[in-house]
Design a protein with these regions (language model features):
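Structural and coupling elements of P-loop NTPases
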Residues: 1-230
């Protein structure tokens, strides 16, 4: 179900009209009906939802998801840590029956027909105005469905807004890199000096081992290790 911290976060997002994408996790375990989960999301988070992927069974019989946004079938293999097979397949084709079985294919077609009848057609502008939240299904433990959500996010998310600096506004279209650290997590492993700095990119492109000016300290710094979503 919806956790307490999620409700608090959504309250802030509604106040600021910040668009969100929802990931329904643990589809490789037995759980509630997807439609029941979507109803709970709309009631608890007070936002309209629109599925952009749909699970094919769940628990031990979980076969994967149909990526509605990309019109592709993403097949699931436990412990592979990735989508093991991505197939562009027509929802009414015999190929779908061969891939997931006739019973699962029939249920998927029935569910998608209900999805199209109940939920509004997805529009990017409606999402960017925080009026609807796209929903993806998957298994975070197996890293299944996560990359597909990130790919969609990169494509539909709004561009950064201009950010005020000390002397001027930073335009996100500028080629030169600018950014600010909004969070630092320390002591994440036994090494007492270890930390992760979370940086919002305001313009340009961040590259490793390049000198960057720390404005407050007036020092030039280099960073050899970065992590980002591909």
């Amino acid at each position: 179900g919806v956790e307490t911290q999620t409700r608090k976060l959504m309250t802030v997002c509604r106040m600021r009209k910040t668009p969100v994408i929802i990931f329904i996790n643990k589809m490789d375990r037995e759980g509630r009906d997807p439609f029941d989960l979507l109803d709970e999301l709309e009631q608890e988070l007070e936002i309209k939802v629109r599925p952009l992927s749909w699970p094919i069974n769940q628990g031990a019989k979980f076969k994967g998801v149909y990526n509605i946004y990309e019109q592709k079938l993403d097949l699931f293999t436990p412990d592979k840590q990735r989508v093991t097979d991505k197939v562009e397949v027509d929802i009414n084709s015999e190929e779908l029956d061969k891939r997931v079985g006739e019973e699962n294919a029939a249920k998927l077609r029935e569910d998608l027909e209900i999805v199209d009848g109940v939920y509004p057609e997805f529009e990017v502008e409606t999402y960017r105005e925080a009026e609807v939240a796209p929903v993806f299904f998957g298994s975070a433990l197996n890293n299944f469905g996560v990359q597909e959500l990130l790919n969609c996010f990169v494509e539909i998310a709004p561009s950064p807004r201009p950010t005020k600096a000390e002397e001027r506004d930073v335009n996100p279209e500028e080629p030169k890199f600018t950014g600010f650290i909004f969070k630092i997590t320390a002591n994440i492993d036994p090494n007492p000096r270890s930390c992760i700095a979370f940086c919002k990119v305001c313009s340009g492109k961040f590259q490793r081992n390049q000198p960057y000016l720390h404005v407050r300290q007036g020092k030039s710094l280099r960073f050899s290790s970065i992590s980002r979503s591909e």
